[in-house]
Amino acid sequence: MSETKRKSIFGYCMYDWGKSAFETSVTTAILPAWFAALFLEANGLTGTVIGMEMTSDAAWSLAVTLGTLMVAIVSPSIGVIADRKRIKMVALKWMTWLGAGSVSLIALAPVFDISFQWVWIFVMFLLANIGLNAAGVFYNALLPYQGEDHEMDEISNKAYAYGYLGGGLLLVAHLVLLFTTDFALWATQVAIGSSGIWWFGFAWYTFAYVAEPEIENEIENLNIKDATKLGVSEVFNTLSEWRNFKTLFIYMLAYFLFIDGINSVTSLAGAFGIAVLGLTMGELIMTILIIQFVAFPAAFFFTLSLIHI
């Protein structure tokens, strides 16, 4: 393997290492408890969110849903742009700025009045989710350029393993910080803010080592309007031919249900643990840590299994 290719794969994996801090420390372990406490203090058991009465865990679910839905709506357009123009790395940087920047800004919630703190977290968390999901479109589009077809599983699993380890290591540091300060407010702010810095900081390996892929038949001057038309038409053309690819269609449908189920569990597990199971933040963090350090070697095990099958 050439040095350039090795660095490119390393840079690709380091993006997962960085952004997993948001998915573990922020989305699952720390922020749900902080959000629930602020929501309860400001509103009581229920509050009004965009005209609807909601509990804290329902409001949290709404933020996750809106972030995912917004990206899903524009995915055909940005997917076409990613495939037809050499902007994958540029767009990945933009979305990382949005996601990581919004995460760090969550830490500023205490500067506002108590009635607005949970609203600030809701908005910043929504923007962070949009950044994460949109970045995922361009990040995943880079995978086929990191190696040959037979190497895709190995590279993908390696990136997952890096993500579990990176997110787990930062969560250990956050656990030590929070326990030694008796969960002081400033410690919570540092934990949240550092997650955004961790995400963007390690993403620089990706920006430095992963090159913008070449594209055959690049479309010049492709704007959002044209990309939307092209993206929607390609989606409908593909769906109209599903009978010719029944096995692939069933696989895609099954994968859609499977991966959305996984993403829903990981995004809402923290809120569920706090609001329904009554876990403390410390208990929730310990649970997530166990999961992270079981998943890390498991991802490498699957990689080795694929190599020898």
Regions found by a protein language model. Give the residues of each.
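Juxtamembrane intracellular "pre-TM" segments in multi-pass secondary transporters
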Residues: 2-10, 213-251
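Short amphipathic helix-loop junctions that connect adjacent transmembrane helices
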Residues: 26-56, 267-284
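Short helix-capping/hinge motifs at transmembrane helix termini and TM-loop junctions
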Residues: 40, 109-114, 143, 178-182, ...
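Substrate-agnostic recognition of the 12-TM MFS/MFS-like secondary transporter fold
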Residues: 11-28, 63-80, 87-99, 120-183, ...
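A single, central transmembrane helix in multi-pass transporters
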Residues: 239-297
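Conserved small/polar residues in nucleotide/adenosyl-binding loops
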Residues: 307-309
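C-terminal ends and interior cores of transmembrane alpha-helices
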Residues: 96-115
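Short hydrophobic/alpha-helical segments at membrane-entry points of transmembrane helices
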Residues: 115-124, 250-251
